[in-house]
Amino acid sequence: MEELEQDLLLQPWAWLQLAENSLLAKVSITKHGYALLISDLQQVWHEQVDTSVVSQRAKELNKRLTAPPAALLCHLDEALRPLFKDSAHPSKATFSCDRGEEGLILRVQSELSGLPFSWHFHCIPASSSLVSQHLIHPLMGVSLALQSHVRELAALLRMKDLEIQAYQESGAVLSRSRLKTEPFEENSFLEQFMAEKLPEACAVGDGKPFAMSLQSLYVAVTKQQIQARQAHKDSGETQASSSTSPRGTDNQPEEPVSLSSTLSEPEYEPVAASGPMHRARLVKSKRKKPRGLFS
């Protein structure tokens, strides 16, 4: 199920309007099962099931219908796709949800092979680790990315001001006075933004502005974070493997190495490890007086 969890992390948040309920949700459906995450900006709910649960629940909700888990999951994907990813083509299925103390139930009513098909997603409160993975860490990354983006734009504006100044010093004159601008002052700009634009810019509302405007950046940030974690994991495994791997020369005494012999013999030719001739060569090499760099 690790593949399913990672795929869910890479999915953007979608804004859903179900009757009077405004929700943010993301879903991943594969041949192995599905994972669903839903939030009303007050709580976060989650469900992840495999094919065995899909088969059992389908039998309980649809007595007349028999289908393999792969077909059921494919149908659920087709029913949810317009709701989550293609709002221009409304889904033929109908959706509703109920919230209770124990969790949230998302109900789906559709048709499969000409027969009524019903499905219930039974979501329970998400763990703190899931909330951190899908909201806290990605949103912190998005904030840092946007801050870096603003700094890059500010640096570009300062370069533009220097370019305009160079044109003016060379005698260039602006033909349209209405296009004239003042040199960019970052601190003044930030102060004005905080005072005039911030209340409107940070209005979260029902989550729709976030889901509609920052999907691509959210996915890019989560992908980068997954790659960073994987690289860190691989590095740790490599270090652990190198520290525990046996060394064949640990129990052998170190012999002094002659720098001159090393320079004169750049290529190492392996020889047989047995036989009297080999032992004689070893004994002879030990009797040599090591030669230093200045000897």
From Swiss-Prot:
Motif XLM per UniProt: ranges: 285-295
A Pfam family recorded for this sequence: XLF
GO molecular function: DNA end binding; DNA polymerase binding
Biased composition (Basic residues): 278-295
A cellular component annotation (GO) from this entry: nonhomologous end joining complex
Disruption-associated phenotype: Embryonic stem cells are highly sensitive to ionizing radiation and have intrinsic DNA double-strand break repair defects. In contrast, knockout mice only have a relatively mild phenotype with no growth defects, neuronal cell death or overt immunodeficiency. Mature lymphocyte numbers are slightly decreased, and pro-B lines, while ionizing radiation-sensitive, perform V(D)J recombination at nearly wild-type levels. Mice lacking both Paxx and Nhej1/Xlf show embryonic lethality caused by severe defects in classical non-homologous end joining (NHEJ).
CDD domains reported for this sequence: HD_XLF_N (cd22285)
Domain of life: Eukaryota
Chain positions with Phosphothreonine modification: 262
PTM sites of type Phosphoserine: 132, 245
Polar residues bias spans: 237-251
Site (Leu-lock): 115
Chain positions covered by the region annotation Globular head: 1-135
PANTHER family per the UniProt record, alphabetical: NON-HOMOLOGOUS END-JOINING FACTOR 1
Subunit structure: Homodimer; mainly exists as a homodimer when not associated with XRCC4. Interacts with XRCC4; the interaction is direct and is mediated via a head-to-head interaction between N-terminal head regions. Component of the core long-range non-homologous end joining (NHEJ) complex (also named DNA-PK complex) composed of PRKDC, LIG4, XRCC4, XRCC6/Ku70, XRCC5/Ku86 and NHEJ1/XLF. Additional component of the NHEJ complex includes PAXX.
Function of the protein: DNA repair protein involved in DNA non-homologous end joining (NHEJ); required for double-strand break (DSB) repair and V(D)J recombination. It is also involved in telomere maintenance. Plays a key role in NHEJ by promoting the ligation of various mismatched and non-cohesive ends. Interacts with POLL (DNA polymerase lambda); promoting POLL recruitment to double-strand breaks (DSBs) and stimulation of the end-filling activity of POLL.
Protein family per UniProt: Belongs to the XRCC4-XLF family. XLF subfamily.
Name the record gives this protein: Non-homologous end-joining factor 1
UniProt gene name: Nhej1
